[in-house]
Amino acid sequence: MLKFLKQVGDYAKESLQAAKAIGQGLGVTFDHMQRRPVTVQYPYEKLIPSERYRGRIHYEFDKCIACEVCVRVCPINLPVVDWVYNKETKKKDLKNYSIDFGACIFCGNCVEYCPTNCLSMTEEYELATYDRHELNYDNVALGRLPYKVTDDPMVTPFREFAYLPKGEYDPHVVPSDRPRAGQRPEELVDQYKQAAAANEEN
């Protein structure tokens, strides 16, 4: 009889320990269920790059004096500067300027040392292509104005992941009415239309 009672007591003890372990695991799960998802559903949601983000290089043809400082400071001598010497003006006439982003390491040396500030780093980071030759940007492609994430109505920009308030280290502490992960572009467009209609009524 005592042996049986001991077995029942041990079984009850083990059951309580198992229930406690399961409860702890479920507690962690439920805690995460209440939080806002941190996964960015790219390409429908995009992080806004930081202010000094080193993305695609923007080039202004009119400012360039063909000094080739960018070529000298580049670790891999990447920029290609084509120019001819004009004997009348005794200056260089720039013909073409190109950078191969397939080889560029985005170090920013060319931008930092450019004497006329004709080069600048943009926030654009989507340079993927099926053909590597398309990554060789000439002066026309480099002169194209950068595309901002915030200008695209089909994309939800996530500012709070890149710009958290001072002293704030937890991206979960954001308003619950912000668009959540998993929304499709058409849903976002409908949401924006409803918000615009509500603003017009007010």
Swiss-Prot record:
Residues 168-202 are annotated as: Disordered. One of its GO terms (molecular function) is 4 iron, 4 sulfur cluster binding. Its main location: membrane. Keywords: 4Fe-4S, Iron, Iron-sulfur, Membrane, Metal-binding, NAD, NADP, Plastoquinone, Quinone, Repeat, Thylakoid, Translocase. Its EC number is 7.1.1.-. It is a peripheral membrane protein. Residues 168-187 have a biased composition (Basic and acidic residues). [4Fe-4S] cluster 1 binds at residues 64, 67, 70, 114. [4Fe-4S] cluster 2 binds at residues 74, 104, 107, 110. It is an enzyme of class 7 (translocase). It catalyses: a plastoquinone + NADH + (n+1) H(+)(in) = a plastoquinol + NAD(+) + n H(+)(out); a plastoquinone + NADPH + (n+1) H(+)(in) = a plastoquinol + NADP(+) + n H(+)(out). The keyword Iron applies. Belongs to the complex I 23 kDa subunit family. NDH-1 shuttles electrons from an unknown electron donor, via FMN and iron-sulfur (Fe-S) centers, to quinones in the respiratory and/or the photosynthetic chain. The immediate electron acceptor for the enzyme in this species is believed to be plastoquinone. Couples the redox reaction to proton translocation, and thus conserves the redox energy in a proton gradient. This is NAD(P)H-quinone oxidoreductase subunit I. It comes from Synechococcus elongatus (strain ATCC 33912 / PCC 7942 / FACHB-805). The lineage of its organism: Bacteria, Bacillati, Cyanobacteriota, Cyanophyceae, Synechococcales.
